[in-house]
Protein backbone atom coordinates (compact mmCIF):
# COMPACT_ATOMS: atom_id res chain seq x y z
CA UNK A 1 0.00 0.00 0.00
CA UNK A 2 1.11 3.53 -0.81
CA UNK A 3 0.32 6.62 1.20
CA UNK A 4 0.75 10.01 -0.44
CA UNK A 5 1.43 12.84 1.99
CA UNK A 6 0.65 16.29 0.62
CA UNK A 7 1.79 19.38 2.50
CA UNK A 8 -0.35 22.12 1.01
CA UNK A 9 0.48 25.80 0.74
CA UNK A 10 -0.87 28.61 -1.41
CA UNK A 11 -0.73 27.62 -5.07
CA UNK A 12 1.56 24.62 -4.60
CA UNK A 13 2.05 21.40 -2.64
CA UNK A 14 4.93 19.23 -1.47
CA UNK A 15 4.36 15.55 -2.28
CA UNK A 16 5.91 12.47 -0.66
CA UNK A 17 4.96 8.80 -1.17
CA UNK A 18 5.70 6.27 1.56
CA UNK A 19 5.13 2.59 2.25
CA UNK A 20 5.18 0.70 5.57
CA UNK A 21 8.45 0.34 7.50
CA UNK A 22 9.65 3.74 6.31
CA UNK A 23 10.12 2.81 2.65
CA UNK A 24 10.34 5.94 0.51
CA UNK A 25 8.58 5.26 -2.80
CA UNK A 26 8.95 8.77 -4.21
CA UNK A 27 11.13 11.39 -2.48
CA UNK A 28 9.46 14.73 -1.70
CA UNK A 29 8.87 16.96 -4.72
CA UNK A 30 6.85 20.10 -5.43
CA UNK A 31 3.73 20.37 -7.58
CA UNK A 32 1.96 23.58 -8.58
CA UNK A 33 -1.82 23.82 -8.40
CA UNK A 34 -2.23 24.02 -12.17
CA UNK A 35 -4.22 21.62 -14.28
CA UNK A 36 -1.17 20.38 -16.18
CA UNK A 37 0.92 19.69 -13.07
CA UNK A 38 -1.96 18.07 -11.21
CA UNK A 39 -2.60 15.86 -14.27
CA UNK A 40 1.03 14.75 -14.19
CA UNK A 41 0.73 14.01 -10.48
CA UNK A 42 -2.43 11.98 -11.08
CA UNK A 43 -0.68 9.90 -13.76
CA UNK A 44 2.34 9.34 -11.52
CA UNK A 45 0.23 8.17 -8.59
CA UNK A 46 -1.94 6.05 -10.86
CA UNK A 47 1.11 4.04 -11.98
CA UNK A 48 2.02 2.98 -8.43
CA UNK A 49 1.61 -0.69 -7.52
CA UNK A 50 -0.98 -1.50 -4.88
CA UNK A 51 -3.66 0.60 -3.23
CA UNK A 52 -2.92 4.31 -2.93
CA UNK A 53 -4.41 6.78 -0.48
CA UNK A 54 -3.80 10.51 -0.28
CA UNK A 55 -3.55 12.43 3.01
CA UNK A 56 -3.46 16.20 3.49
CA UNK A 57 -4.30 18.72 6.19
CA UNK A 58 -7.21 21.15 6.25
CA UNK A 59 -5.67 24.50 5.34
CA UNK A 60 -8.51 26.93 4.75
CA UNK A 61 -9.12 26.89 1.01
CA UNK A 62 -5.57 26.05 -0.03
CA UNK A 63 -6.11 22.29 -0.06
CA UNK A 64 -9.26 22.37 -2.20
CA UNK A 65 -7.65 22.37 -5.69
CA UNK A 66 -5.48 19.32 -5.02
CA UNK A 67 -8.12 17.48 -2.97
CA UNK A 68 -10.90 18.02 -5.53
CA UNK A 69 -8.70 17.15 -8.52
CA UNK A 70 -7.39 13.91 -7.02
CA UNK A 71 -10.87 12.96 -5.81
CA UNK A 72 -12.25 13.47 -9.32
CA UNK A 73 -9.35 11.35 -10.61
CA UNK A 74 -10.60 8.43 -8.54
CA UNK A 75 -8.14 8.46 -5.64
CA UNK A 76 -9.03 7.85 -2.00
CA UNK A 77 -8.43 11.29 -0.51
CA UNK A 78 -8.45 12.05 3.21
CA UNK A 79 -8.36 15.60 4.56
CA UNK A 80 -7.52 15.49 8.26
CA UNK A 81 -7.52 18.06 11.03
CA UNK A 82 -4.15 19.78 11.31
CA UNK A 83 -4.09 19.35 15.11
CA UNK A 84 -4.24 15.56 14.77
CA UNK A 85 -1.22 15.54 12.49
CA UNK A 86 0.63 18.11 14.61
CA UNK A 87 0.50 15.88 17.70
CA UNK A 88 1.52 12.79 15.71
CA UNK A 89 5.16 11.76 16.08
CA UNK A 90 6.13 14.84 18.08
CA UNK A 91 8.46 13.00 20.44
CA UNK A 92 11.64 14.41 18.95
CA UNK A 93 13.47 17.10 20.90
CA UNK A 94 14.38 18.84 17.65
CA UNK A 95 11.23 19.73 15.77
CA UNK A 96 12.44 21.35 12.58
CA UNK A 97 9.59 22.20 10.27
CA UNK A 98 10.07 21.91 6.52
CA UNK A 99 7.59 21.18 3.76
CA UNK A 100 9.45 17.99 2.82
CA UNK A 101 9.41 16.64 6.37
CA UNK A 102 5.76 17.58 6.76
CA UNK A 103 4.85 15.71 3.57
CA UNK A 104 6.64 12.60 4.84
CA UNK A 105 4.97 13.01 8.23
CA UNK A 106 1.54 13.15 6.58
CA UNK A 107 2.31 10.02 4.57
CA UNK A 108 3.41 8.14 7.70
CA UNK A 109 0.34 9.37 9.55
CA UNK A 110 -1.82 7.94 6.78
CA UNK A 111 -0.05 4.57 6.98
CA UNK A 112 -0.51 4.36 10.76
CA UNK A 113 -4.20 5.35 10.50
CA UNK A 114 -4.90 3.55 7.22
CA UNK A 115 -8.14 1.87 8.29
CA UNK A 116 -9.62 4.94 9.98
CA UNK A 117 -8.77 7.66 7.47
CA UNK A 118 -11.95 9.67 6.82
CA UNK A 119 -12.82 9.89 3.15
CA UNK A 120 -12.98 13.35 1.63
CA UNK A 121 -16.20 14.09 -0.23
CA UNK A 122 -16.41 17.49 -1.98
CA UNK A 123 -19.37 19.66 -1.12
CA UNK A 124 -21.99 20.16 -3.79
CA UNK A 125 -22.04 23.54 -5.50
CA UNK A 126 -24.98 24.92 -3.51
CA UNK A 127 -23.49 24.12 -0.10
CA UNK A 128 -20.08 25.38 -1.15
CA UNK A 129 -21.53 28.68 -2.33
CA UNK A 130 -23.71 28.96 0.77
CA UNK A 131 -20.69 28.51 3.05
CA UNK A 132 -18.61 30.98 1.03
CA UNK A 133 -21.44 33.53 1.00
CA UNK A 134 -21.84 33.21 4.76
CA UNK A 135 -18.13 33.89 5.29
CA UNK A 136 -18.44 37.03 3.19
CA UNK A 137 -21.57 37.96 5.15
CA UNK A 138 -19.66 37.70 8.43
CA UNK A 139 -16.85 39.90 7.10
CA UNK A 140 -19.32 42.45 5.77
CA UNK A 141 -21.19 42.50 9.10
CA UNK A 142 -17.95 43.40 10.89
CA UNK A 143 -17.33 46.23 8.41
CA UNK A 144 -20.89 47.49 8.82
CA UNK A 145 -20.57 47.55 12.61
CA UNK A 146 -17.29 49.45 12.35
CA UNK A 147 -18.77 52.00 9.93
CA UNK A 148 -21.90 52.42 12.04
CA UNK A 149 -19.83 53.09 15.16
CA UNK A 150 -17.74 55.57 13.19
CA UNK A 151 -20.84 57.46 12.05
CA UNK A 152 -22.26 57.54 15.57
CA UNK A 153 -18.93 58.86 16.85
CA UNK A 154 -19.06 61.67 14.30
CA UNK A 155 -22.65 62.49 15.18
CA UNK A 156 -21.75 62.74 18.87
CA UNK A 157 -19.93 65.95 17.95
CA UNK A 158 -22.26 67.18 15.20
CA UNK A 159 -25.75 65.90 16.05
CA UNK A 160 -25.75 64.12 19.45
CA UNK A 161 -28.24 61.24 19.86
CA UNK A 162 -29.33 61.44 16.22
CA UNK A 163 -29.02 57.67 16.01
CA UNK A 164 -31.62 57.34 18.78
CA UNK A 165 -34.27 59.51 17.17
CA UNK A 166 -35.97 56.60 15.41
CA UNK A 167 -36.83 53.06 16.48
CA UNK A 168 -37.74 51.87 12.98
CA UNK A 169 -36.08 48.55 12.01
CA UNK A 170 -33.83 48.32 8.99
CA UNK A 171 -35.57 47.78 5.66
CA UNK A 172 -35.08 44.73 3.46
CA UNK A 173 -32.52 46.64 1.40
CA UNK A 174 -30.49 47.44 4.53
CA UNK A 175 -31.41 51.12 4.77
CA UNK A 176 -32.22 52.63 8.19
CA UNK A 177 -34.32 55.70 8.89
CA UNK A 178 -31.84 57.43 11.19
CA UNK A 179 -29.03 56.99 8.65
CA UNK A 180 -31.16 58.47 5.88
CA UNK A 181 -32.17 61.31 8.20
CA UNK A 182 -28.64 62.42 9.09
CA UNK A 183 -27.72 62.33 5.40
CA UNK A 184 -30.27 65.12 4.92
CA UNK A 185 -29.69 66.79 8.32
CA UNK A 186 -26.00 66.14 9.14
CA UNK A 187 -25.81 68.77 11.91
CA UNK A 188 -28.19 69.65 14.72
CA UNK A 189 -28.17 73.28 13.53
CA UNK A 190 -29.71 72.04 10.27
CA UNK A 191 -32.80 71.46 12.42
CA UNK A 192 -32.70 74.03 15.21
CA UNK A 193 -31.59 76.71 12.75
CA UNK A 194 -35.11 76.54 11.31
CA UNK A 195 -38.37 77.47 12.89
CA UNK A 196 -40.49 74.63 14.24
CA UNK A 197 -43.07 75.09 11.50
CA UNK A 198 -40.50 75.21 8.69
CA UNK A 199 -38.69 72.11 9.97
CA UNK A 200 -41.96 70.19 10.30
CA UNK A 201 -42.83 70.97 6.69
CA UNK A 202 -39.34 70.04 5.54
CA UNK A 203 -39.42 66.80 7.55
CA UNK A 204 -42.79 65.89 6.06
CA UNK A 205 -41.42 66.42 2.57
CA UNK A 206 -38.39 64.28 3.43
CA UNK A 207 -40.59 61.45 4.73
CA UNK A 208 -42.66 61.51 1.54
CA UNK A 209 -39.53 61.42 -0.63
CA UNK A 210 -38.01 58.42 1.18
CA UNK A 211 -41.23 56.51 1.76
CA UNK A 212 -41.41 56.94 5.53
CA UNK A 213 -44.55 57.60 7.55
CA UNK A 214 -44.89 61.18 8.74
CA UNK A 215 -45.91 61.90 12.31
CA UNK A 216 -46.44 65.44 13.58
CA UNK A 217 -45.49 64.57 17.16
CA UNK A 218 -42.33 62.86 15.98
CA UNK A 219 -41.31 65.97 14.08
CA UNK A 220 -41.72 68.04 17.24
CA UNK A 221 -39.69 65.51 19.26
CA UNK A 222 -36.86 65.66 16.72
CA UNK A 223 -36.91 69.45 16.78
CA UNK A 224 -36.83 69.54 20.59
CA UNK A 225 -33.97 67.02 20.70
CA UNK A 226 -31.90 68.98 18.18
CA UNK A 227 -32.44 72.27 19.99
CA UNK A 228 -31.64 70.68 23.34
CA UNK A 229 -28.17 69.48 22.38
CA UNK A 230 -24.89 71.31 22.07
CA UNK A 231 -22.66 70.37 19.15
CA UNK A 232 -18.88 70.50 19.45
CA UNK A 233 -18.27 70.37 15.72
CA UNK A 234 -19.11 73.64 13.93
CA UNK A 235 -21.59 73.60 11.08
CA UNK A 236 -19.25 73.84 8.10
CA UNK A 237 -18.92 72.27 4.67
CA UNK A 238 -16.20 70.02 6.08
CA UNK A 239 -18.50 68.77 8.84
CA UNK A 240 -21.19 68.02 6.27
CA UNK A 241 -18.67 66.21 4.06
CA UNK A 242 -17.50 64.00 6.94
CA UNK A 243 -21.02 62.94 7.90
CA UNK A 244 -22.24 62.47 4.33
CA UNK A 245 -19.22 60.35 3.43
CA UNK A 246 -19.65 58.24 6.56
CA UNK A 247 -23.31 57.74 5.65
CA UNK A 248 -22.36 56.77 2.10
CA UNK A 249 -19.92 54.12 3.31
CA UNK A 250 -22.42 52.72 5.81
CA UNK A 251 -25.17 52.57 3.19
CA UNK A 252 -22.91 50.63 0.83
CA UNK A 253 -22.01 48.11 3.54
CA UNK A 254 -25.65 47.74 4.60
CA UNK A 255 -26.77 47.21 1.00
CA UNK A 256 -24.07 44.56 0.51
CA UNK A 257 -25.12 42.85 3.73
CA UNK A 258 -28.76 42.78 2.61
CA UNK A 259 -27.81 41.38 -0.81
CA UNK A 260 -25.69 38.62 0.77
CA UNK A 261 -28.48 37.79 3.22
CA UNK A 262 -31.00 37.47 0.39
CA UNK A 263 -28.60 35.28 -1.59
CA UNK A 264 -28.06 33.00 1.41
CA UNK A 265 -31.81 32.69 1.81
CA UNK A 266 -32.18 31.79 -1.86
CA UNK A 267 -29.39 29.19 -1.70
CA UNK A 268 -30.67 27.67 1.55
CA UNK A 269 -34.21 27.40 0.16
CA UNK A 270 -32.93 25.12 -2.62
CA UNK A 271 -31.56 22.54 -0.15
CA UNK A 272 -33.71 19.43 0.42
CA UNK A 273 -33.61 19.77 4.23
CA UNK A 274 -34.77 23.40 4.17
CA UNK A 275 -38.52 22.72 4.77
CA UNK A 276 -37.70 20.41 7.69
CA UNK A 277 -35.37 22.92 9.35
CA UNK A 278 -37.79 25.82 8.85
CA UNK A 279 -40.52 23.71 10.44
CA UNK A 280 -38.54 23.33 13.67
CA UNK A 281 -39.61 25.28 16.73
CA UNK A 282 -37.72 28.54 17.17
CA UNK A 283 -36.34 28.67 13.62
CA UNK A 284 -37.18 31.78 11.61
CA UNK A 285 -35.78 33.92 8.81
CA UNK A 286 -33.17 36.57 9.54
CA UNK A 287 -34.39 39.86 8.14
CA UNK A 288 -31.88 42.28 9.64
CA UNK A 289 -28.20 42.25 10.47
Which residues does each PLM region occupy?
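A detector of single, family-specific signature residues
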Residues: 1-289
Amino acid sequence: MNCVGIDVSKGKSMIAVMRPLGEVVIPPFEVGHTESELCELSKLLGNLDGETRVVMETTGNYHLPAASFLYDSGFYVSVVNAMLVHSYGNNSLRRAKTDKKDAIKLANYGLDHWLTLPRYIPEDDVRLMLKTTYRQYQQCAKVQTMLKNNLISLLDTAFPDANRLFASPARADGSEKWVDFVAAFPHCECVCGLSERVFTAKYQKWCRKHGYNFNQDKALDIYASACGHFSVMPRTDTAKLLVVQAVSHLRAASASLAALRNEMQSLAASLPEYPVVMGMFGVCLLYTS
